[in-house]
Amino acid sequence: MAWQVSVPELEDRLQCPVCLEVFKEPLMLQCGHSYCKGCLLSLSRHLDSELRCPVCRQEVDSSSSPPNVSLARVIEALQLPGDPEPQVCTHHRNPLSLFCEKDQELICGLCGLLGSHQHHRVTPVSTVYSRMKEELAALISDLKQEQKKVEEQVAKLVNNRTRIVNESDVFSWVIRREFQELHHLVDEEKARCLEGVEGHTRGLVASLDMQLEQARGAQERLAQATCMLEQFGNESHYEFIRYHSTASSAELQQARLLEGAFSPISFKPGLHQADIKLTVWKRLFRKVLPAPESLKLDPTTAHPLLELSKGNTVVQCGLLAQRRASQPERFDYSTCVLASRGFSCGRHYWEVVVGSKSDWRLGVIKGTASRKGKLNKSPEHGVWLIGLKEGRVYEAFSCPRVPLPVAGHPHRIGVYLHYEQGELTFFDADRPDDLRLLYTFQADFQGKLYPILDTCWHERGSNSLPMVLPLPSGPGHLTPSQPTKL
């Protein structure tokens, strides 16, 4: 015969109606219902009237309730060996088979029927256990997810920390290297200044030594002449008169020739003490600038009047327009031309020889700026220029324009672009070791910037001199490394 009930369902049917646990020492009442021996005795003790079966409410005699041996054997067969003994209620000595949802504590069946938990919602321990196991599993799952997130965060923090330390080490190495090179340059300038002072001093001292030697020789000769004259002072009248007439005038004339022979010399090393730091800083500033760029002009951007030569490094405004294709890149109104290479990051320095031109402009322009029609010379239109007008007015094309107090007429202009810092600086570069600041634009550069030269109108030949992009030359320059990114 096949079983129609599973073991879990069978266990549910073998529960005591009082404690809702599997029967312990089951006793059978006259009505046929069975109860745990402990539950039945507890009911009998706590009832003043006749005992009624909690299931069918029939009056029964608990004293004549025999053990339900068959039920006990079934329960014994279902029980696993080694199952722990259930905990018991301290009040009724019955197994803790129920859980009070209100008070959140374990109780026995009598506590739920007769005790302080009589009207509370109670749940079998097995059900509560299953529910709590599910809640615990869900909590563990949530905790594992949170743990995974925290582990990922820890890994990111560790990687971030490692990256910061590595970048710091690299940047510290760069700083040490740069300062070593700066110290080397400072030592070179120090040696140069000292050598200049010492060389100047050697020349002055040599001149003074020569004068001193001449003066001491004259001093000795005068002493000898004086001694000789004093000796003749003791001669007879005739001898004295004879010598005086021939020698004294000659000795006196020689003494007069020595008067004014000494010329005082002042120590002028060409470097004032108060200007040492400024002078050295100017020299160092030139050396720490990036190495000059080797630029060429782009013929496809040149205005038709412009003539390019010497490998596209020289441009001048001609009298006749050149036959050139009309291209979007070409200027058709302003006499401008761009360099063939632009810059969208980093630090760059280049120079432009303007010579004795009476009118010129130079600077940088955004690659997207319009090249058709009159050039809008202002930062708002992506153009940053300085220039000379009518051979006497230097100006920066900002808004509004700014006149520049330029001393003299620079023939060579230096341009320094620091893209990330948004700085475009112009210098008088006639003296390589003494760059003189002309003007600095501050801007938030976007996109590629191109060096631009504007020769201006030739003025019927009076402004036809060329502008030149010179090849880099001269002493080596310290080229600082690009800064590292955190």
From Swiss-Prot:
GO terms for cellular component: cytoplasm. GO terms for biological process: innate immune response. InterPro entries: B30.2/SPRY (IPR001870), B30.2/SPRY_sf (IPR043136), Butyrophylin_SPRY (IPR003879), ConA-like_dom_sf (IPR013320), PRY (IPR006574), SPRY_dom (IPR003877), TRIM/RBCC (IPR050143), Znf-RING_euk (IPR027370). It catalyses: S-ubiquitinyl-[E2 ubiquitin-conjugating enzyme]-L-cysteine + [acceptor protein]-L-lysine = [E2 ubiquitin-conjugating enzyme]-L-cysteine + N(6)-ubiquitinyl-[acceptor protein]-L-lysine. Auto-ubiquitinated. Acetylated by EP300 and KAT2B. HDAC6 drives TRIM50 deacetylation. Acetylation antagonizes with TRIM50 ubiquitination. Keywords: Acetylation, Coiled coil, Cytoplasm, Metal-binding, Transferase, Ubl conjugation, Ubl conjugation pathway, Zinc, Zinc-finger. The keyword Transferase applies. The keyword Membrane does not apply. SUPFAM superfamilies: B-box zinc-binding domain, Concanavalin A-like lectins/glucanases, RING/U-box. GO terms for molecular function: ubiquitin protein ligase activity; zinc ion binding. Residues 125-170, 204-235 form a coiled coil. A zinc finger (RING-type) spans 16-57. Its main location: cytoplasm. Gene3D superfamilies: 2.60.120.920, Classic Zinc Finger, Zinc/RING finger domain, C3HC4 (zinc finger). Zn(2+) binds at C89, H92, C111, H117. It comes from the Eukaryota. A zinc finger (B box-type) spans 84-125. It is an enzyme of class 2 (transferase). It is found in: Cytoplasm. Belongs to the TRIM/RBCC family. E3 ubiquitin-protein ligase that ubiquitinates Beclin-1/BECN1 in a 'Lys-63'-dependent manner enhancing its binding to ULK1. In turn, promotes starvation-induced autophagy activation. Also interacts with p62/SQSTM1 protein and thereby induces the formation and the autophagy clearance of aggresome-associated polyubiquitinated proteins through HDAC6 interaction. Also promotes NLRP3 inflammasome activation by directly inducing NLRP3 oligomerization independent of its E3 ligase function. This is E3 ubiquitin-protein ligase TRIM50. It comes from Sus scrofa (Pig). The lineage of its organism: Eukaryota, Metazoa, Chordata, Craniata, Vertebrata.
